[in-house]
Amino acid sequence: MKTGIITMLFVLYLPVTAFATTLRLSNDIDLLVLDGKKVSSSLLRGADSIELDNGPHQLVFRVEKTIRLSSHEERLYISPPLVISFNTQLISQVNFHLPHLETEREAAHFSTTPRLELLDGDAMPIPVKLDILAITSTAKIIDYETETERYNKADKRASLPQFATMMADDSTLLSGISELDAVPPQSQALTEQRLKYWFKQADPQTRNNFLQWAEKQPPS
C-alpha cells in the first residue's frame, strides 16, 4: 500500500520543484483526475495529503457525504463530477472547505449549483474556477481522464487547455514496450511504464534525489 502511494506521487509530480504545495485530502472528496491524469482512489486511500508543484492545477472530483433523509434515515450522497482549477503560486497548502451538506435538500441544491472553497494554510480563500463536468459517454464505466481532456479542449469555465495535451497518454507510454523488461500484469505494467516515462523526463539532480530516497524505503 505504501509503495503504491509512493509510486503514484513520483509519477504524477516529477519534476520536483524547490517550492511545493501540500494538497490536504478530505474523506468527503473522491479525487478522480489531477492535472489531466487519472488518479487511482485505491492508491490515495490512507494518504493525508499529496504534493503539488507551484503553478496552475486542475482537479476533477466528487463529493461523497452521508446525509439525512426526511424519514430520518441516512444515505450516501454522491455529487456529479466537478472540475476546479486554481494556481498554487506562493501557496504552501491547499485545503478543501465544503458548504453545509447534511440534508437531502442541501445535497440537491449542491448537485445543481455546487459551491465550495479552497483555503490556504492561513484559512484564506484561494481564487478558483469551479464547474460541473458534464459526462458525454454512455458507457457503464466512465473514463474520467478522457472526459476531462474533452472538457479542457472545449474552453469551458474551469478549462486548462495545457492539461489536454501536455501529459502523455497511456497508449504513448505503452508504445515503447519493446524497450522495457518483460511485462508484468497489466496494472503493474502501466504503473511501471509511467514511472519510467517520468523518470526519463526528470533532470539529473531530480533523478539522483529520487534514487537516494528510494534506497531508504523499506520493501513492501
UniProtKB/Swiss-Prot annotation:
What keywords appear on the UniProt entry?
Signal
**Disulphide bridges, residue numbers:** none
- State whether keyword Signal applies: yes
State the signal peptide span: 1-20
Which InterPro entries does UniProt cross-reference here? Answer: UPF0319 (IPR018635)
The regions listed as transmembrane in this protein's record are none
Any Pfam family the entry gives = DUF2057
Carries keyword ATP-binding? no
Family affiliation: Belongs to the UPF0319 family.
Mind telling me what this protein is named?
UPF0319 protein CKO_02102
